[in-house]
Design a protein with these regions (language model features):
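Intrinsically disordered terminal and processing segments
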Residues: 30-33, 39-43, 72, 86-90, ...
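N-terminal mature ectodomain segment of secretory-pathway/periplasmic proteins
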Residues: 30-107, 136-139
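Bacterial N-terminal signal peptides that target proteins for export
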Residues: 2-13
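Gly/Pro-enriched, hydrophobic low-complexity segments
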Residues: 146-241
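Tryptophan-centric aromatic hotspots in well-structured domains and transmembrane helices
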Residues: 45, 70-72, 119-120, 168, ...
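Flexible, processing/modification-adjacent segments and terminal tails
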Residues: 27-31, 96-166, 186-189, 242-243
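Hydrophobic helical h-region of N-terminal Sec-dependent signal peptides
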Residues: 14-19
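C-terminal motif of bacterial Sec signal peptides marking the signal peptidase cleavage site
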Residues: 21-24
C-alpha cells in the first residue's frame, strides 16, 4: 500500500462534499435520488449503529487497502491502514471534532474516509447531499457494453467540498439499482474521467451494497472493491456480514 498522500490522485476522485449525511432545511431532497436511495435501504438506515468495510483499489502501479468502522449516529470513525514504510497505522476520531485532530487525520485519513465512504454508500449520499443538482436525463446507452439505462446525473456545486464541481452520471436499471457510472472531475487533478460498473451486489442487514466496480480511470484499467462489509444494528453487538 502506498502512503495516503501519494495516492491522492486516484483515491480522492469522488470527494464531492465535506459533511456526511448533512441536510439543509432550506433545500429539498431530490425525489429521483430518494427513489434510488430507498432501493438501497434508505428507510432502514436509521437502524444502523455501525458500518464496517475495507476499501481496496487496484490500478497500474498502485494497490491500496484501507479498513474503516463508521458510526453514523455519533460520527465516530476508526481507521486501520499502513504508512509509506508499510507500518500499521490506526486512528479513531469524531468528525465533529476534526479541527482538534492531528494533521495526518485532517489531511490524509479523513479525506480518505470521505472518498471510500462515498464509493460504498453513494446512493445515500446523492439523497443526503441537498446541495447537489440531481437530474433525470432519460434513457441512454450504457458506457460499457450493450444496453441502455436511465441516466441520473448528480452534480456538486463548484464551491463545496474537497473536489468541487464533480459530476456522477449514474446509469440506473428498471429495478432502481445503479448498473454503471461515469465520474467527471470538476477540477484539474487526475483522473479526469472514471467509467465503472456497479456489481457484486450484497445485502448487509437492511442495506444493499455494490461491492465491486470494474472499469477505467483516464483509460487505464481500474478495479475498486469492498471486502469485510458488515453492519451492526441498534441494540445489537453482533456484526451482520454482507452476503
Amino acid at each position: 500500500m502506498r502512503k495516503l498522500g501519494r495516492s491522492t490522485t486516484i483515491r480522492c476522485i469522488v470527494l464531492g462534499v465535506l459533511v456526511l449525511a448533512a441536510t439543509s432545511c432550506s433545500q429539498k431532497h431530490s425525489s429521483v435520488a430518494e427513489q434510488i436511495a430507498k432501493t438501497y435501504g434508505l428507510d432502514s438506515f436509521g437502524q444502523i449503529d455501525a458500518i464496517r468495510y475495507t476499501f481496496n483499489l487496484q490500478f497500474p502501479g498502485l494497490n491500496v487497502s484501507r479498513s474503516w468502522v463508521w458510526e453514523p449516529k455519533t460520527g465516530q470513525v476508526s481507521y486501520e491502514g499502513k504508512d509509506k514504510d508499510g507500518k500499521p497505522v490506526k486512528a479513531t476520531y469524531v468528525r465533529s471534532q476534526l479541527s482538534s485532530q492531528s494533521d495526518a487525520v485532517k489531511n490524509d485519513i479523513d479525506p480518505g474516509f470521505i472518498n471510500d465512504n462515498y464509493w460504498l454508500l453513494f446512493p445515500f449520499h446523492a439523497y443526503w447531499d441537498t446541495s447537489a443538482n440531481v437530474q433525470d436525463k432519460g434513457k441512454q446507452e450504457l458506457p460499457l457494453g450493450n444496453g441502455s439505462a436511465e441516466l441520473v446525473s448528480v452534480k456538486y456545486p463548484s464551491d463545496v467540498g474537497y473536489a468541487p464541481g464533480d459530476t456522477w452520471d449514474l446509469y440506473v436499471g428498471k429495478d432502481n439499482r445503479i448498473e454503471q457510472f461515469v465520474y467527471h472531475r470538476g477540477g484539474p487533478k487526475k483522473p479526469s474521467v472514471v467509467i465503472a460498473t456497479w456489481e457484486g451486489y450484497k445485502k448487509a442487514g437492511p442495506l444493499l451494497i455494490s461491492t465491486d466496480h470494474r472499469g477505467t480511470a483516464d483509460g487505464g484499467p481500474l478495479r475498486l472493491f469492498f471486502s469485510d462489509v458488515a453492519v451492526k444494528l441498534t441494540g445489537s453487538d453482533t456484526w451482520m456480514n454482507a452476503q
